[in-house]
Amino acid sequence: VFGTLGSTDDSLFGRYKQDIFNDHRGHLQGQAYGSR
């Protein structure tokens, strides 16, 4: 799910996911999204 969404909309979804997951456990996910 993450790979698909990130690959499709890296700009829109990446930002949204980063913000949402930053509160739960996006520190790692956020960094991965930023790098990708």
UniProtKB/Swiss-Prot annotation:
Keywords: Antibiotic, Antimicrobial, Secreted. The keyword Secreted applies. One of its GO terms (cellular component) is extracellular region. The keyword Secreted applies. GO terms for biological process: defense response to bacterium. It is found in: Secreted. InterPro entries: Gloverin-like_protein. Antibacterial protein. This is Gloverin. It comes from Heliothis virescens.
